[in-house]
Regions:
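PLP-dependent class I/II
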Residues: 1-178
Length: 178
């Protein structure tokens, strides 16, 4: 099974890339998609999200029967979850209005432009990086063998730039994101 977080789908500009996992043939039989609107609409921390569990997503039980994951998910949500507060639901609904979608695209455009400027600067300096296209983040290796937290401190103190240390992403974390 594939669990697909579509938090960054609104940053995708390449028309050949899928914005939903369900744009890929066969995904309804093997994938669940969720999105919090944290990146699309700045809803970080509000606990407003959606989850798509297709009716086609079924599993075989040990006794040879089938089990609908869609039905199990619905049962779980109805039993354990009291719902998102009304004020957050109202704000979430506004995201999907014409005006809300326009405002979201304006904000995303701001982040895209920041990524473009950072990428342009890194290219001019000859610094190899990844990201910045179809994503708001740019990742590059820390210089001179510095650890990512050490480079984070250096950037903050010397350039007043805040990045994300790669150490939190595993053992190959000698990278930083800006």
């Amino acid at each position: 099974m594939i669990l697909y977080d579509s938090a960054y789908e609104a940053f995708i500009t390449d028309p050949t890339l899928p914005r939903s996992i369900y744009a890929i043939e066969g995904a309804k039989n093997c994938a669940i998609e969720f999105c919090s609107l944290s990146k699309t609409a700045g809803f970080t921390g509000t606990r407003f999200s959606y989850t798509v569990v297709p009716e086609e997503l079924v599993f075989e039980t040990s006794n040879g029967g089938t089990l609908s994951l869609h039905n199990m998910w619905n049962r779980r949500q109805c039993t354990k979850f009291n719902g998102t507060p009304y004020i957050i639901q109202y704000a979430g609904a506004k995201v999907f209005t014409e005006e809300g979608m326009k405002e979201c695209q304006e904000n995303i455009g701001y982040y895209r432009e920041n990524a473009r400027m950072i990428a342009e600067t890194l290219e001019k300096k000859g610094i190899s990086f990844t990201g910045g296209v179809n994503s708001p983040y740019i990742w590059f290796e820390c210089p001179k063998g510095m650890e990512s937290w050490e480079f984070f401190d250096y950037l903050l103190e010397n350039a007043q730039v805040v990045g994300t240390p790669g150490a939190g992403f595993g053992e190959n974390g000698r990278i930083i994101s800006v």
